[in-house]
Amino acid sequence: LLIVNKEPYIIVHPTQKKVDKTLANAVVNYFEKTLGKTLVPRFYNRLDMNTSGLIIIAKNAYTQAFLQDKTEVKKTYKVIASGIIEEDDFFIEKPIGKIGDDLRRIELSEENGGKSAKTHIKVLERNYEKNITFLEARLYTGRTHQIRAHLSLIGHSLVGDELYGGNMEIAKRQMLHAFKLEFQNPKTLENLKIEIDIPIDMKEVLK
C-alpha cells in the first residue's frame, strides 16, 4: 500500500488536456525510484482536483481486490460550509445524479437515474462572524461530488465551491479535505486508522 496526502490543484489521472504533472505520473516515478520497476498505480479512491487529502494506492491486484471486496474503508472529510448549520449531528440521505452535460449532481430519484447517497454530518465549530461552519462528513456511499452535492441540497454549499454556489469571497477552491481513513491491513488484518491535518488554506479561512 501507498498512502498519499494529495495537495489541492493536482489532478489524479492524466486527461486529454493534462497528460503530465498528475498524481499518477508522480506515483509511477516514485515506484521506479524506490522499487526499481514500473508499477501501474491502482487508486482505491480518487479526489477532485481542488480537493485535498488522503488517497490509497494499491501496489498489486490482491491489495486492490481486498480493499474493494474484503474490508470496509471508512472515509471521513473535514469541510468548511457556507452559512451556519444549526443541527449538531445528523445524516443527509438524498439520492443524487446528473442530467446531461451539467457537471453538478442534483437530487434525482433512483427511478430517474439517481443513486442512493448517505452522508453523516458532525458540526465541529460555528463561526458567526464569517458565517461559516466547520464540520466532519463521513461517507456511507461513494458517489461523485457526494459531500458537495448533499451540503448544497440543504442550503450550505462548501466555501469556495463555485460549481455549487458556495461563498467565493474567502476561498478560491472548495474547502474539502479527506483527513481520515480506517480499514484493515491487507497483510496482517489489523485495523488501521490514518489521519492528516487540514492544509494551510483551510486553517486561514477558519481564523
Residue ranges and their predicted role:
Residues K37-Q68, K94, K98-I154, A178-K207:
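The conserved catalytic core of RNA pseudouridine synthases
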Residues G83-I85, N127, Y164, D197:
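Short, solvent-exposed coil/turn elements at secondary-structure transition points
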Residues V159-K187:
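RNA substrate-recognition surfaces in RNA-acting enzymes
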Residues L1-G100, D201-V205:
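RNA pseudouridine synthases
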